[in-house]
Amino acid sequence: RELDALGGEMGKNIDKTFIQSKMLNESKGPAVHSLRAQADKQDYTSEMRRVLENTDHLTIRQAEISEILTEPAEEGGEKKRITGVKALSGAVYHCRAVVLATGVYLGARCVYGDVSNPTGPNGLQAANHLTDSLKEHGIEMYRFKTGTPARADRRSIDFSKMEEQFGDKRVVPFSFSTDPETVQREQVSCWLTYTNEKTHEIIRENLDRSPLFSGAIEGTGPCLL
């Protein structure tokens, strides 16, 4: 799988921390088979951090990068080369190359119905300074959107009225380097429910507040997280 490229720690990590794994579209041809795993969020984060902190030749610094630093590649020329990055604190890290893994934080906005907030997901701040720096270097920004379903407290749910959905009996690892026998473990079920006339009524009465229909957000998507 493509997750095994460049070391593939994401695939290895989900194999260690998934709570359910399922191969989707198995009734169709192999070209559309899609492996889906759901993780214990805290375990995934802790395990990935442990791996990073114990990786040789990797130094970790926590800071908000606000500026990409460059200089002319040739005297009098228009082309530029990277010289480093600058943090919001003023600290400068010199380098010859920069890899940006920005996720969904460049100029991020979170939209809840008719409320829009200039922030990243889960209350984490958006990388607005870095966004401005990239624009200054001639890099165009396009808006992508994701849709995140509401999180429900399991204590408020009547599971007896829902359909239980199990993970695969024989789990396929995400990483080719994972021993398949190490991922055969007890899993957490998913649960399926349906809308009804009441939920349809609520939706119809509030369509004008939905950013997908009101035009409040634009961009390619959506992707559900």
Regions found by a protein language model. Give the residues of each.
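Active-site helix-to-loop segments that bind/position phosphate- or nucleotide-bearing substrates
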Residues: 206-225
